[in-house]
Amino acid sequence: MIEFDNLTYLHGKPQGTGLLKANPEDFVVVEDLGFEPDGEGEHILVRILKNGCNTRFVADALAKFLKIHAREVSFAGQKDKHAVTEQWLCARVPGKEMPDLSAFQLEGCQVLEYVRHKRKLRLGALKGNAFTLVLREVSNRDDVEQRLIDICVKGVPNYFGAQRFGIGGSNLQGALRWAQTNTPVRDRNKRSFWLSAARSALFNQIVAERLKKADVNQVVDGDALQLAGRGSWFVATTEELAELQRRVNDKELMITAALPGSGEWGTQREALAFEQAAVAAETELQALLVREKVEAARRAMLLYPQQLSWNWWDDVTVEIRFWLPAGSFATSVVRELINTTGDYAHIAE
C-alpha cells in the first residue's frame, strides 16, 4: 500500500517547503450546508465558531447544556481542533420553548446564531466548505505561484487526506489487523473509521497508479464517468470515446475511480482490469470490505478547487482561498503546492 506522502503527484513533487498551520488562525474553515434552516420544527440548528476544540467535544458540551442525551446532537462533518472553524450543530429539542443559547459558554467556542429546523442534520449533509489558508516560510515563491495557476486549469488528485487514516495511520493499521484476525469489532466508531480508512486507501492507490501510467484525464474503454457535481455515473464505450473525451476536457464530465467494496465496481473492460490490477495485492482489505457489506461506489479522480484565489503578503507568506465540495480534503490541494512542515502538517481537518 502506498503511503499518503508517497502518492503520485499530478503536477510533480513540489520544489519548495512551507509551514501549514503555524497557528490555528492560518487554517479557517466555513461550512456551507447548501440550504436555509426551516425556521420551525423539533430540531435547533446552532451555528458555532470554534478554535482549539474538536466538534464532538463541543457537541457533547451543548447536549449537557440543553440537558439532552449526547446522541441527540448531530453535525454534518468533523472539523479540525487546530483551526478556526465555523459549522452547524443540530440538537433535537421537541416540545420545548427555544432555549437561550447565548448563555452557552465553552472556552474557544462562540454561538453565532440558532434557529429551529424540521430535520436532523446528518453526517455528510452539507454542500461543501470554504477554506482560507495561510502558508508561511514558503521557500520557493515562483514554484508555488506556477502551481496555483496550473491547479486552476488542471485541478489536483482527489485523494483522501492523511487525516482519513488517523494519526500515524492508526485507522488503516486497525483495518489491517481486523482483516487479518477476523476478530469482531464491537465499537461502532472504530468500525466506521477503520472501514472508511480501508476503502479510502484503496481508492488512493487506484488514482496514484492511474497517474503513474496514463493521463488521468484520458478516457479509456469502460471508464465510469459522472456529470460534474452529480453522483450518478455511466460507462464509456469505444464508440463514444471521442465525444466523451471532449466533455471531460470541458469539465462537463469527470472520470471516476472505484471505492472498492461489495458488488460491482462500475467500470468495465480495460478500465476495470486496470483498477483490479492496481489493488491486486490488497486482498485482505478488499475481503474485509466485502465481508462487512460495504457497498462499492465511485469518486471523481480529480478535484477542481472552486473560487481559487491567492494573495502574497510578502515573498514567503501567501493567503489562499478556495471552496471544496463535501468529502474533499484541503490538504490534498496543499500537497500539490508545497512540502509542508510543522507539527500540524497532517492533523485532521
Swiss-Prot record:
Presence of keyword tRNA processing: yes
Keywords: Isomerase, tRNA processing
Gene3D superfamilies: TruD, catalytic domain, TruD, insertion domain
GO molecular function, one term: tRNA pseudouridine(13) synthase activity
Family: Belongs to the pseudouridine synthase TruD family.
HAMAP family associated with the record: TruD
Protein name as catalogued: tRNA pseudouridine synthase D
